[in-house]
């Protein structure tokens, strides 16, 4: 009786062992491709704010580029452009502009666009790589001017690799014969990043499909279907340097923005 009990136990043990061996032989190994997780301090800080924040990078800016930064951003919901001629434009966020919003370029607030309706942004539209727009009260972060929001132009970030890069861009418009272009050259080596850009635009008087217009209840003739004194040109030069190593960071930007353009007669006062 005891012998049968022992033999039955041994038989069950060998059966279980053989079944486990068959199951282990049928398991297949699968190699998964690597998963790369990237992040930055800038994006982490953006998630902490309760304001409506939108970030627009180079691909969006190129797709909607018009030669004027504010006109490029006017497709953003809540952002509007107050255009004065072909070159000057002032931004508005949710109906407010002038000294009710702040415009920052590389950490420096633009002051010129606040004074009057005929003062636009002194910024080269070709020289913008990334724009961050905050909609809502931001006075604690950017000063008392940022009651309605902020348009912040962010500096170019290094790729942390030794490289030589460049860019050439052309712009043309038929409505006023605009011809423009920009050339950029840059080098990144070790902890240094240096970039130089030159941009220039020329444009003539606006073409309109009418021979007369009504301005302040007066009938004004349009000779040759062109709005006289709306031509102009602009020439911009900028140099940017960036140094980053461990806990040290330095950014230097020098720019010269020159704009000369006319205003349509009657833009200020009664037409002659």
Language-model regions, residue ranges each:
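Flexible loop and strand-edge segments within Gram-negative outer membrane beta-barrel domains
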Residues: 22, 228-234, 247-272
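N-terminal periplasmic "start-of-domain" segments of outer-membrane beta-barrel proteins
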Residues: 33-62
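Structural signature of outer-membrane beta-barrel domains
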Residues: 42, 98, 110, 156, ...
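N-terminal periplasmic accessory domains that precede
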Residues: 69-72, 87-92, 104, 118-121, ...
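Short sequence motifs at beta-strands and strand-loop junctions characteristic
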Residues: 83-85, 143, 173-177, 225-234, ...
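Outer-envelope beta-barrel architecture signal
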Residues: 101, 162-166, 179, 190-194, ...
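Short acidic/polar hinge/loop motifs at secondary-structure boundaries
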Residues: 108-135
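Transmembrane beta-barrel strands of outer-membrane/channel proteins
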Residues: 168-174, 181, 187, 196-202, ...
